[in-house]
From Swiss-Prot:
Domain of life: Eukaryota
Organism: Mus musculus (Mouse)
Region of interest (Disordered), ranges: 1-32
Protein name (record): Clathrin light chain A
GO biological process, one term: intracellular protein transport
Pfam families registered for this protein in UniProt: Clathrin_lg_ch
Membrane spanning stretches: none
Function recorded in the entry: Clathrin is the major protein of the polyhedral coat of coated pits and vesicles. Acts as a component of the TACC3/ch-TOG/clathrin complex proposed to contribute to stabilization of kinetochore fibers of the mitotic spindle by acting as inter-microtubule bridge.
Native organism taxonomy: Eukaryota, Metazoa, Chordata, Craniata, Vertebrata
Gene: Clta
InterPro entries in UniProt: Clathrin_L-chain
N6-acetyllysine carried by residues: 210, 229
Record region (Involved in binding clathrin heavy chain): 99-161
Biased composition annotated in UniProt, kind: Gly residues: 13-25
Length: 235
């Protein structure tokens, strides 16, 4: 008795004529067998495409996984996103982040750079603070120097006034003044030039008209000396 296939067709001998419903049909193709062969061919092609995609580093598509019809057709989908069971990145963004992580600087270098930045900022702040302190100190010292100079000048003026008053109050002050003028005249002789003789003579005279120490009227002599000083005689 011949064996029957799942669709009720008797299984013929390999290479023999196909029989349908007990009737021999030489050259007639079984539609069920052709359909199964076509499905197997498509499944084999899909599996080959998935294999090539995985080798290229890509994840199999959602439609492709569902078309395969296997029990793990939806294993690669979670919360609307694809994931890959391997250790590699799932997409280009993950790959970029992975490269950045691998190429990122070590923790020690990052800490050293942060410490250097903080140290430079502290040095800049300290330099600005010291500069402000030096400027303030320099201004203060300059003001103190000007104050000391002014005080010394006032003291010098006061001492000079006291010395002048004491000199003129002492006896023979006029004589001392004449002697000093004569000494100055003698010192100028060596350095004199022609035509300045009367000018040197005028230095020895007191031309103050209000002087009360003069017992005689010397106004005429005073006028003569002044005229000779202004217009010396020509030899």
């Amino acid at each position: 008795m011949a064996e029957l296939d799942p669709f009720g067709a008797p299984a013929g001998a390999p290479g023999g004529p196909a029989l349908g419903n007990g009737v021999a049909g030489a050259g007639e193709e079984d539609p069920a067998a052709a359909f199964l062969a076509q499905q197997e061919s498509e499944i084999a092609g899909i599996e080959n495409d998935e294999a090539f995609a995985i080798l290229d580093g890509g994840a199999p598509g959602r439609a492709t996984r569902r078309a395969a019809g296997g029990p793990d057709a939806v294993d690669g989908v979670m919360n609307g996103e694809y994931y890959q069971e391997s250790n590699g990145p799932t997409d280009s963004y993950a790959a970029i982040s992975e490269v950045d992580r691998l190429q990122s600087e070590p923790e020690s270098i990052r800490k050293w750079r942060e410490e250097q930045t903080e140290r430079l900022e502290a040095l800049d702040a300290n330099s600005r603070k010291q500069e402000a302190e030096w400027k303030e100190k320099a201004i203060k010292e300059l003001e103190e120097w000007y104050a000391r100079q002014d005080e010394q000048l006032q003291k010098t003026k006061a001492n000079n006034r006291v010395a002048d008053e004491a000199f003129y109050k002492q006896p023979f002050a006029d004589l001392i003044g004449y002697v000093a003028a004569e000494e100055a005249f003698v010192n100028d002789i060596d350095e004199s030039s022609p035509g300045t003789e009367w000018e040197r003579v005028a230095r020895l005279c007191d031309f103050n008209p209000k002087s009360s120490k003069q017992a005689k009227d010397v106004s005429r002599m005073r006028s003569v000396l002044i005229s000779l000083k202004q217009a010396p005689l020509v030899h």
